[in-house]
């Protein structure tokens, strides 16, 4: 089954009897777990009717108060009162190209607040997938997949002119773009489309880049949305299948040095929803002190990695910022091993001026 066929199948599953209630309960558990890790927001690029779905989720009523005996409390209402709808995360709900026309007709555009969300939910970017992935050998590359697949370069999900057409439609109707591009050839085609259409937004993953394309990201104002934990998961596969790459894999520091805005995430559920795993991978280039770093020349310093993990692109709040705060029990700039960074203890998390997690009772 291809991705577009899965899109329609997933939407039908999402609307099956009882699915919405069960999913909402799972989301409440997930947002509590996210708060324990210091997460205050997500971008939902699931192949689904995300705008309508999240509008319903923000308006749904919760059947349970928080557990007053929970020593490490998670929830929105500190007094234990009932919470209505999802209130533990900011959400940007992405729109796929196949649903873009419907979203435009409904009056949506990137940045519009979702009804009933109290400012926590907004319409996100138009999400588009230009190529495949490394592990499936379907990321579209300028060089073949080594001697194992000597005549195979990966695949494109859309022809370049189709990508350009979707970018044009999104841009004309005030949608940002968020385009998945992993192979180095895909990461040439996507900036080409952004150049001709004046599209703005992000390139998702940007895992393999030709050196000449890196400064283009900065020139075009495109954000590189990266998931450093993928480098840890893929390092052995990269060595096997991208032994003679046409570009630089996981070029974090090269992008930063070129002035490209970095935005770090997890790509959950592909990797766990845990920012400290991503930060650790970006800073140390390895999951274990017992293994040498992967591409140490592309590692980031801790301050840059932490800033890239925030919505505002800074590691410290400033007057006028939303009151989304994370209190830590350890100085992240004094950490010396990947194990310590991955185990970063979060003491409390605040979202929009309200605590969503705290282990500081009585202190």
Question: Residue locations for each model-derived region?
Answer:
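Short, small/polar residue-rich loop motifs at catalytic or cofactor-binding pockets
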Residues: 121-122, 342-344
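Phosphate/diphosphate-binding loops
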Residues: 73, 82-127, 201-207, 211, ...
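Divalent metal-binding segments
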Residues: 1-87, 93-108, 128, 135-186, ...
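Secondary-structure transition/capping motifs at alpha-helix termini
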Residues: 60-67, 82-89, 112-119, 172-173, ...
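His/Asp/Glu-enriched, well-ordered alpha-helical/loop segment
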Residues: 12-15, 25, 167-178, 185-201, ...
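Non-cysteine beta-strand/loop elements that form the S-adenosyl-L-methionine
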Residues: 120-138, 222-231
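Short, isolated positions in well-ordered beta-strands
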Residues: 135, 356-357
């Amino acid at each position: 089954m291809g991705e577009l066929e899965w899109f329609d199948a997933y939407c039908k599953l999402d609307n099956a009897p009882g699915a919405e209630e069960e999913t909402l309960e799972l989301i409440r558990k997930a947002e509590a777990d996210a708060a324990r890790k210091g997460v205050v927001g997500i971008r939902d690029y699931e192949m689904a009717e995300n705008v309508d779905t999240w509008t319903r989720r923000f308006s749904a009523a919760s059947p349970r108060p928080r557990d007053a005996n929970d020593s490490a409390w998670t929830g929105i209402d500190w007094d234990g009162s009932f919470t209505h709808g999802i209130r533990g995360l900011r959400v940007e709900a992405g729109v796929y190209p196949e649903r873009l026309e419907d979203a435009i007709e409904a009056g949506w555009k990137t940045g519009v607040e979702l009804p009933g969300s109290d400012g926590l939910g907004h319409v996100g970017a138009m999400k588009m997938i230009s190529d495949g992935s490394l592990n499936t050998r379907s990321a579209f590359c300028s060089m073949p997949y080594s001697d194992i697949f000597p005549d195979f370069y990966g695949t494109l999900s859309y022809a370049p002119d189709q990508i350009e057409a979707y970018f044009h439609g999104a841009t004309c109707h005030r949608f940002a773009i968020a385009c998945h591009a992993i192979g180095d050839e895909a990461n040439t085609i996507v900036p080409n489309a952004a150049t001709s259409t004046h599209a703005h937004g992000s390139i998702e993953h940007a895992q393999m880049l030709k050196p000449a394309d890196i400064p283009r990201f900065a020139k075009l104002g495109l954000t590189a949305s990266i998931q450093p934990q993928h480098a840890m998961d893929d390092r052995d596969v990269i060595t096997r299948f991208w032994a003679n790459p046409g570009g630089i894999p996981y070029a974090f520091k090269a992008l930063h040095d070129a002035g490209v805005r970095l935005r770090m995430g997890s790509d959950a559920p592909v990797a766990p929803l845990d920012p400290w795993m991503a930060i650790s991978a970006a800073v140390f280039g390895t999951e274990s002190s017992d293994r040498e770093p992967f591409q140490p020349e592309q590692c980031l310093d801790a301050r840059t990695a932490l800033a890239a993990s925030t919505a505002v692109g800074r590691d410290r709040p400033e007057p006028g910022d939303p009151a989304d705060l994370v209190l830590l029990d350890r100085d992240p700039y004094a950490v010396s091993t990947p194990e310590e960074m991955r185990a970063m203890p979060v003491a409390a998390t605040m979202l929009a001026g309200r605590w969503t997690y705290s282990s500081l009772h009585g202190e």
